[in-house]
Design a protein with these regions (language model features):
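Terminal, intrinsically disordered low-complexity segments enriched in charged/polar
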Residues: 103-105
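Acidic/charged, solvent-exposed loop-and-adjacent secondary-structure segments enriched in E/D, K/R, S/T
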Residues: 99
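Acidic, serine/threonine-rich low-complexity disordered tracts
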Residues: 8-94, 112-206
Length: 206
């Protein structure tokens, strides 16, 4: 089951502040501009039915929880989606088995590699669903972020196959820094989350 760890004081402050700063009547471009001016990691998330500006609420040993002002949450680790709360996907958990190339996608070339995952979905009580991904770099392209800033990013595609699952994840990565600025990731069969960074998270050194 998806577990939401308690936010640290600073991160809880960021969530509370953004809920106050971003009014319900704000359009998303205005909300993104407001949030970008704040000293908090932030992004724009869209699952095809729900779209929101979100801020980082917690870092649980690298598993990040992102929160909207409507209390919708999704979790990711290394930029890879691993859980949702309050979204139609109903993803309790997703985990990579074996080597994790998403710690630095720049190590993946055009020849590609195989990624093994398991998904846990509440709908239909589908837990431990094995999914295999074929991940490779497919080129570079110019990508605009939610503030209209354009970057030339490396594009990676991951073709997914498993019982009742077929689809493609797409990732756009800064070839110089390795920052995953944009992605479109499977959250459930036929449900994708599109994630666009506004301000990346800089983890403090321990």
């Amino acid at each position: 089951m998806l577990m939401l760890a308690g936010c640290g004081t600073v991160m809880q402050t960021s969530v509370d502040f953004v809920r106050t700063a971003v009014a319900g009547k704000d359009d998303l471009s205005e909300a993104a501009t407001k949030v970008a001016a704040l000293p908090y990691a932030s992004l724009l998330m869209d699952d095809g039915q729900y779209r929101a500006v979100m801020v980082l609420g917690n870092d649980d040993e690298g598993r990040l929880s992102w929160h909207s002002r409507q209390a919708v949450v999704f979790l990711c680790e290394g930029g890879v989606l691993c859980g949702t709360h309050g979204l139609r996907a109903g993803l309790d958990d997703a985990r990579i088995e074996g080597d994790n190339p998403f710690t630095d996608l720049r190590t993946v070339g055009e020849a590609g590699i195989t990624v093994s995952r398991r998904y846990d979905w509440r709908s239909g009580y589908r837990y431990g669903v094995p999914v295999t991904g074929q991940l490779r770099r497919v080129g570079q392209e110019s990508v605009a972020d939610p503030l209209g800033r354009s970057r030339t990013l490396a594009r990676y595609e991951e073709r997914l196959e498993g019982p009742g699952v077929e689809g493609t994840n797409t990732y756009w990565v800064d070839p110089a820094t390795g920052v995953l600025w944009k992605s479109r990731q499977l959250a459930a069969p036929d449900v994708y989350l599109e994630i666009n960074l506004i301000k990346p998270y800089r983890r403090r050194s321990q």
